[in-house]
C-alpha cells in the first residue's frame, strides 16, 4: 500500500538530519536554507514487537515488517504561497503526500542559522508552526478561489455536484478565518466531497519537536491542539550509525527506552489510518498494511490482486489467541480459528490465511 508522509518545516529545523536517520539514506543536511531542493523519498520499517513473538512460534526463514514512506520536502518560508523561496515546488510536493509530519525547532544553536533577522538562539515553536500553517491555509484559499467559478457552473448542470460546490464555499469562508480545513465540522457526505478539492490543510498532521538532548523529558505545550513528539535529531543520527547492541547501550546511557524514530514511524503509520494483519508460515512472518476499516477481500488484495478477485473466505485467528495458544494448531483445537466472509472487517493484528479461486 503506497501511502506517504511528507516531512516539512522551516529551513534548518533538522528535517534532513531526521530523514537521514530514519531512512539511513544520505541526504543533504546543510546550514543554509533550501539544502533540500528535490524531495528525497525513503521507505521506513514500522517497528512491531508482535512480529518477533509470532516468529518465536513459527520459526520462519525471515521476518518482514510493515513499512511507511517518508518524503523530505524543501524548507518552507513565509510567502511560499506566492512562490517565495521554493514555495511553488514545496506546495506541489506536499500535495502529493497523504499526511504531514512537521518538524519544529526547539533546540538552540548559534551556529545553525534561522531565517533573516533571527539568531540560532531564538526559539518559537508555536510561531514557526503558525507560519507554515498560514502558508498552507493561504495556498488552499488560492486553490478554492480558482475552483469555485468552475464548480458553480458544473453544479448548475449537474445537481450531484451541488454538495461539492457548497462545501467548497463553506471551506473558503472557514479558511479565511485562519482555520485549517480539517477542523471544520462536516457531514460524511461533505467530507467525501471535500476530499475531491485536494486541500493541503485537510491532510492529517503530526508535529515533531527537534530538541536538545537535555530537553527530551520536558513537558511540551500542544501545537494546534496536538502534543508534539519529542525527538533529538542529533541523537537519532548517531543511533542510526550504531549496530543494535551498541545502540541499545547508548539508549540505556541516555535513559531512553527506544529510539525516537521508532515512535515516529509508529505514529506516522497511525496518522495515515493504517493497521497491520499478519501471515505466518515457515518461509516468513510478514506484516501487511491495510487501511483501518478494510474488508477481508481488500486485505487479500494487498497480497495479490488475484486473492481479492477470487476471494472465497478468510481463516482468521486473533493475535492474542495465536500467541496464547501457541500457534495455528492450538488455536484450531481451542475453537479460536474463525471462518470469515467478504463482509468481514479486518482487526489490527489478525493472523490470516486466505482461500481463493481464480
Model-derived features: where do they sit?
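Active-site-proximal flexible loops/turns
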Residues: 27, 79, 135, 147, ...
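C-terminal-of-GTPase-core extension/linker across diverse P-loop GTPases
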Residues: 2-8, 13, 19, 150-347, ...
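Short alpha-helical basic/polar micro-motif
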Residues: 16, 52, 92, 142, ...
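Phosphate/Mg2+-binding loops and adjacent switch elements
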Residues: 81-206, 216
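Short, intrinsically disordered, mixed-charge
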Residues: 24, 56, 92, 134, ...
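Conserved G1/Walker A P-loop phosphate-binding module
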Residues: 1-84, 88-114, 120, 126
Amino acid at each position: 500500500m503506497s501511502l506517504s508522509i511528507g516531512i516539512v518545516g522551516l529551513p534548518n529545523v533538522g528535517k534532513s538530519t531526521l530523514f537521514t536517520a530514519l531512512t539511513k539514506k544520505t541526504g543533504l543536511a546543510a546550514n543554509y536554507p533550501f539544502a533540500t531542493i528535490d524531495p528525497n523519498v525513503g521507505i521506513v520499517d514500522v517497528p512491531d514487537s508482535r512480529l518477533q513473538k509470532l516468529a518465536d512460534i513459527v520459526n520462519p526463514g525471515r521476518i518482514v515488517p510493515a513499512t511507511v514512506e517518508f518524503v523530505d520536502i524543501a524548507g518552507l518560508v513565509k510567502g511560499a504561497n506566492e512562490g517565495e523561496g521554493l514555495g511553488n515546488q514545496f506546495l506541489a510536493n506536499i500535495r502529493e503526500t497523504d499526511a504531514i509530519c512537521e518538524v519544529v525547532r526547539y533546540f538552540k544553536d548559534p551556529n545553525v542559522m534561522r531565517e533573516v533577522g533571527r539568531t540560532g538562539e531564538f526559539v518559537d515553536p508555536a510561531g514557526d508552526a503558525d507560519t507554515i500553517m498560514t502558508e498552507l491555509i493561504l495556498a488552499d484559499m488560492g486553490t478554492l478561489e480558482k475552483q469555485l467559478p468552475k464548480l458553480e457552473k458544473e453544479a448548475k448542470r449537474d445537481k450531484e455536484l451541488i454538495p461539492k460546490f457548497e462545501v467548497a464555499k463553506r471551506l473558503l469562508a472557514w479558511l479565511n478565518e485562519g482555520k485549517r480545513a480539517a477542523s471544520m465540522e462536516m457531514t460524511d457526505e461533505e467530507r467525501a466531497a471535500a476530499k475531491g478539492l485536494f486541500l493541503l490543510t485537510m491532510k492529517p498532521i503530526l508535529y515533531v519537536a527537534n530538541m536538545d538532548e537535555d530537553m527530551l523529558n520536558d513537558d511540551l505545550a500542544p501545537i494546534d491542539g496536538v502534543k508534539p513528539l519529542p525527538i533529538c535529531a542529533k541523537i537519532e543520527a548517531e543511533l542510526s550509525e550504531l549496530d543494535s547492541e551498541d545502540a541499545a547501550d547508548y539508549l540505556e546511557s541516555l535513559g531512553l527506552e527506544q529510539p525516537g524514530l521508532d515512535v515516529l514511524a509508529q505514529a506516522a503509520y497511525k496518522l495515515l489510518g493504517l493497521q497491520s494483519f499478519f501471515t505466518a508460515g515457515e518461509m516468513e512472518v510478514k506484516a501487511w498494511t491495510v487501511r483501518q476499516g478494510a474488508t477481508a477481500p481488500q486485505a487479500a488484495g494487498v497480497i495479490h490482486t488475484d486473492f481479492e478477485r477470487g476471494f472465497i473466505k478468510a481463516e482468521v485467528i486473533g493475535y492474542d489467541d495465536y500467541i496464547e495458544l501457541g500457534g495455528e494448531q492450538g488455536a484450531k483445537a481451542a475453537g479460536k480459528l474463525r471462518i470469515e466472509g467478504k463482509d468481514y472487517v479486518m482487526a489490527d493484528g489478525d493472523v490470516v490465511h486466505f482461500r481463493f479461486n481464480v
